């Protein structure tokens, strides 16, 4: 039986490359930077242009599908997540990196049907790395098959996370306290590249053993989530329960063992869900 969503995935890869070219061109020029929810939550005209290109191109080809995009939600659209085929679009994951020309900037496209991940595309466009994952068919980077690491001993692990965009003192206290608790176990280290999607893809490559974060959004996770699971990894809530795309929090790890060990250390940050906004 033919794969009903392969054509969608192939089209998404083409569009991600086009978006990446737009971003690389924009990096050569001066940019207008605007502030969203906090002084560390930035948006540029390029974010909006790239999302408009992606949304309009996909809507023209698949008018019956649903769409959730970062900049559309920022402009006031509701996050309505149903069983219908739904595209999750983050035009520039790592906008602060983009603004500073720090070379980790990604286009993220996730596609879900019946609320299950079917495929994900993460194009780290400065690096020219195209990460893809298709349900039941594996995860790849530039055509090379990905496999998570086998390191389940947290004392020998390398984790990735972010400080996040909130600058509220209590939120920062929890974020830094969680990092301190994990480092004190001890572990080999914690790294940050400034984009949730690329952080998750690094788990899929085996370069990092796990990633955790609270305060991100569904469009940050929808593309990379299936890349992690198709590389042999797991997605889990930071409480140790099942992963919930709308919860704004995640552990993406090489194994249930490591994910649960991380969850044991984490203090939870109270967050409004994406589907409550």
UniProtKB/Swiss-Prot annotation:
The coenzyme or cofactor needed here is:
Mg(2+)
Q: What induces it?
A: By lithium Li(+) in hippocamp.
Residues that coordinate or bind Mg(2+) 1: 70, 90, 92
Give compartment(s): Cytoplasm
Pfam family, any one? Inositol_P
Single GO molecular function: protein homodimerization activity
* Activity control summary: Inhibited by Li(+), Ca(2+) and Mn(2+), but also by Mg(2+) at concentrations above 3 mM.
Residues that hold substrate according to the record:
70, 90-95, 194-196, 213, 220
The Gene Ontology biological process annotation of the record reads: inositol biosynthetic process; inositol metabolic process; phosphatidylinositol phosphate biosynthetic process
Where along the chain is Mg(2+) 2 bound?
Answer: 90, 93, 220
* Coiled coil (UniProt feature): none
Among Gene3D superfamilies, the record links this protein to: 3.40.190.80, Fructose-1,6-Bisphosphatase, subunit A, domain 1 (3.30.540.10)
What is catalysed by this protein? a myo-inositol phosphate + H2O = myo-inositol + phosphate; 1D-myo-inositol 1-phosphate + H2O = myo-inositol + phosphate; 1D-myo-inositol 2-phosphate + H2O = myo-inositol + phosphate; 1D-myo-inositol 3-phosphate + H2O = myo-inositol + phosphate
Belongs to which family?
Belongs to the inositol monophosphatase superfamily.
The role this protein plays is: Phosphatase involved in the dephosphorylation of myo-inositol monophosphate to generate myo-inositol. Is also able to dephosphorylate scyllo-inositol-phosphate, myo-inositol 1,4-diphosphate, scyllo-inositol-1,3-diphosphate and scyllo-inositol-1,4-diphosphate. Also dephosphorylates in vitro other sugar-phosphates including D-galactose-1-phosphate, glucose-1-phosphate, glucose-6-phosphate, fructose-1-phosphate, beta-glycerophosphate and 2'-AMP.
Record's subunit section: Homodimer.
The name under which this protein is listed is Inositol monophosphatase 1
Q: Which species is listed as the source?
A: Mus musculus
């Amino acid at each position: 039986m033919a794969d009903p969503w392969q054509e969608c995935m192939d089209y998404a890869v083409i569009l991600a490359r086009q978006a990446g070219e737009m971003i690389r061109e924009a990096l050569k020029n001066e940019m207008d930077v605007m502030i969203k929810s906090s002084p560390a939550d930035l948006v540029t005209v390029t974010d909006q242009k790239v999302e408009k290109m992606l949304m309009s191109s996909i809507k023209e080809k698949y008018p019956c599908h649903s769409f959730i995009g970062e900049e559309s939600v920022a402009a006031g659209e509701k996050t309505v997540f149903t069983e219908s085929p739904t595209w999750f679009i983050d035009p520039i994951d790592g906008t602060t990196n983009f603004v500073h020309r720090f070379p980790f900037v990604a286009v993220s496209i996730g596609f879900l049907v019946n609320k299950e991940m079917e495929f994900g595309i993460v194009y780290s466009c400065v690096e020219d790395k195209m990460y893809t994952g298709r349900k039941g068919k594996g995860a790849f980077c530039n055509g090379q098959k990905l496999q998570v690491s086998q390191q389940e001993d947290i004392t020998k692990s390398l984790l990735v996370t972010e400080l996040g965009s909130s600058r509220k003192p209590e939120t920062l206290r929890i974020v830094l306290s969680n990092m301190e608790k994990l480092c004190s176990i001890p572990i080999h280290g914690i790294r940050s590249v400034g984009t949730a999607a690329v952080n998750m893809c690094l788990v899929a490559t085996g370069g990092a053993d796990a990633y955790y974060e609270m305060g991100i959004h569904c469009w940050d996770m929808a593309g990379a989530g299936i890349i992690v699971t198709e590389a042999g990894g797991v997605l889990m809530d930071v409480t140790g329960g099942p992963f919930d795309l709308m919860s704004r929090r995640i552990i993406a790890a090489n194994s249930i063992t490591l994910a649960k060990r991380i969850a044991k250390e984490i203090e939870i940050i109270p967050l409004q869900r994406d589907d409550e906004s």
